[in-house]
Amino acid sequence: MEDSGYMARAAFIMDKIMHKIGLHGKSFIPLVMGFGCNVPAIMATRTIESRSSRLITILINPFISCSARIPIYILLVGTFFPQYASLVFIGLYLFGIIVAVITAKLMRRFFFKVDETPFVMELPPYRMPTAKATFRHMWNKAEQYLRKMGGVILVASVIVWFLSYYPRPKASYERELTPHEQMEQQSNSYLGKIGQAVTPLVEPLGFNWKVTTSLLSGTAAKELVVSTLGVLYSESDADETISLSQKISQPNPVTGIPDFTPLVALSFMVFVLLYFPCIASVIAVAKEAGSWKWGAFTVLYNCLLYTSPSPRDT
């Protein structure tokens, strides 16, 4: 679409609508790019001449559901909302867009009241993208994703596994632990201690320490949320035949209550949509906005935005 010249015309067509929410026509392209990844989308705001419109576009971009959140949605929607999968999936995307629009209007009203920059944009001619250029873009995007998967995500997954596996009780070297002992070992692991320390902050939302720990790992990359849940719910080799979706919906052997219910799952997905952006996004916000205060603002605003009552209390 970029090579064909359509994206520039899309920005021109959307200018009137974008102005109604306090943005610029050129803000449309970075927001659309945010559905792929927020980091290049934030960097794409460099084309916006207006300082205020550029800042608003940068700050609302993390509310756009990037592709890294899709595995989380697929896992929970497929497990708890199979009959309404399309409705819930689309609803999450629309909710993120609505939050972004409301945030943009609030920022335009209270922080950035003046924007007199006219819309000036060169419209390139329509042209048919060549196969060579298309495959080059595909290769570059695939290479970036594989580097991310094989680099940050792989290393982080190994670290998460190590922190959840150690320290080991002496009995584990002599025999296979019982389900109760496995739960106790995970609870006393390094990762368990970290998760339990943070759990009181999100416990009203219905999240236990395993869920909280997956959210903490998601600050490095949202792809890590599902892999962390997979590590924490892999209690023994005998469980390898049981899928993660089955494990999270089964009753907890200690409490007798499932860690995830439909309401907790919905709350979790909305929380993932709104909470702390990945570290790469925060760095991109600070770099493109020109100050770390905007990176800190993004973290605080996104974390404080989710104030719904606990699903277990409804």
Stretches with model-predicted labels:
Residues 306-313:
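Conserved small/polar residues in nucleotide/adenosyl-binding loops
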Residues 21, 42-54, 161-302:
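Extended, low-charge hydrophobic alpha-helical regions
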Residues 67-88, 283-288:
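Transmembrane helix-loop junctions at the membrane interface of multipass transporters and ion channels
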Residues 35-40, 59-74, 91-100, 220-226, ...:
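Membrane-embedded alpha-helical segments of transport systems
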Residues 31, 86-94, 266, 295-300:
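Hydrophobic alpha-helical transmembrane segments
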Residues 8-34, 113-137:
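Juxtamembrane inter-helical linkers in multi-pass membrane proteins
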Residues 90, 94-117:
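Transmembrane alpha-helices and their membrane-interface boundaries in multi-pass membrane transporters
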